[in-house]
Amino acid sequence: QSSGKEDYIPMNKLIKKVLVGITAATMMFGSVCTAYAATDSATVAPAPEKQTNVKADNGAKVSTAANGTATVKALPKTTKKSVTVASKVVVDGVSYKVTTIGAKAFANATKATTVTLPASIKTIGAQAFTGAKSVKTIVIKSASVKVAKTAFKGVNTKKMTIKVSGMSAKQLKAFKAQLKKAGFKGTVKKVSK
């Protein structure tokens, strides 16, 4: 005849096994849910895509590329005397690096006398300043910029000054040569950053 103590020990071991099993299952389920949630949130982030003439969060009209860059097509209409092009724009929640100034980008800034281009700008496109009749000073912070031959088409550049701050002597010389080909007849100055 077995005693109550002998019956109690196996039951106690059984309860421990059940509890260990439940705890392990709970931990495993929690880990799977956490991993799933992490994977799910990672796939939600929108990717850069090619779009033409879309409105950015700052009101500018831009064209975007799948590599995460953007071309400024038109700044928002303004009567400000000083206009600064943003180095980044956001379209549909995606941030794009502004690298190019497109045709007639400053046509809406008819009163602007000073235009500042960020260090991210790599290209000043054809007819970029066409329509910007009041501009007298252009500040360029880039180290190297390509200038299209018709960038200043229809603009009187004789009284215009371009100030550069990020160029070496060699880069400045090459930049001046490009400006000459583009018909620029104003002054180019190197200024401190």
Residues covered by each model-derived region:
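Bacterial Sec-dependent N-terminal signal peptides
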Residues: Q1-L19
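Consensus positions within tandem repeat domains that build extended binding/scaffold surfaces
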Residues: A103-K104, G125-A128, T150-A151
